[in-house]
Amino acid sequence: MDWNQLRVFATVAEVGSFTGAGKVLGLSQSAVSRQISTLESDLGVMLFRRHASGIVLTEPGVELQQAVADMSSRLALATGRINEYRDTPEGPLRITTTVTFGSAWLSARMNTFLETYPDISVSLLLVDNLELDLGRGQADVAIRFTRPTQPNLVQRKLMSMHYHIFASEEYIAANGCPKTVDDLDEHRIIVYGEDVPAPVDNINWLLNVGRPEGKPRTPALRVNSVHGIYRAVLSGLGIAALPYYLSDESPKLVEILPELCGPSMDAYFVYPEEFRHSKRIEVLRDFLLDEVKAYKHIHKADAT
């Protein structure tokens, strides 16, 4: 089968008419009709039923449409992978990570990255409680906070980050600032919800720190999103443990009891083995490692 004929067929099937397909392809209606007739003759089946009101795919036509769609998808994927071997970093780059980290730490650094590599276009795919499948091409790169175990993924640790205790200036002005761990008993505590997997072990340590065993504090609010907890703290609702990098997001966020350090999480730069030689991924990895070094220099108490 001739690929040009298949391309014409796929366009006719999508548009629903020979005339419309001709406009898309820059061909006359008669040229499109001849291509389809030749293809039908070669295959020995009718691909379309012609009606006064238009054309409709036959059953063999539906089968061929799906096959051509699969071929086009595979060709596009192969072309994209071949382009990874170019020396110049260019093209689309899809990065997936959590909503909070992507909205705060990562997105704040994308301007510098894109100014350095203007031929790369970035899509940030931010999701919580779900990991996009890199092996199935749902994203090109991931920044994960659990160590990947799949053998076909390349990983590089970026850094470890700790949870610290924060409140807003507004909350402290209205309720005072805890000076000791025991003082936390007199304040509204915001914690992570129990109905979804936590992003880090012992994330609700604030309920138990300084308390007798089996007698945790009662939280004022549970939220099943770190970003939601962050917004609640900023609103002046209460005190919560948050990743330290969020302290860069708002000058109204005040660290409480800085001598207390909560659980930590490791951030990993992850991508499929087949992209090992991708220039786009290489420059992104090196850029983020440089950004991590700068972050560690500024926030020596947090990142390791």
Where do the protein language model's features map onto the residues?
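Short helix-loop hinge/linker segments at domain boundaries
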Residues: 52-55, 62, 73-96
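C-terminal regulatory
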Residues: 133-136, 148-268, 294-304
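A short LG(V/I)-centered, amphipathic sequence patch enriched
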Residues: 40-57
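Short helix-boundary/capping micro-motifs
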Residues: 11-26
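Residues within the DNA-recognition helix of helix-turn-helix
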Residues: 28, 35, 109
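A bilobed periplasmic-binding-protein/Venus flytrap-type ligand-binding module shared by bacterial periplasmic
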Residues: 267-277
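Central regulatory/effector-binding core of bacterial HTH transcription factors
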Residues: 91-151, 301-304
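Conserved amphipathic alpha-helical core elements
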Residues: 39-40, 253
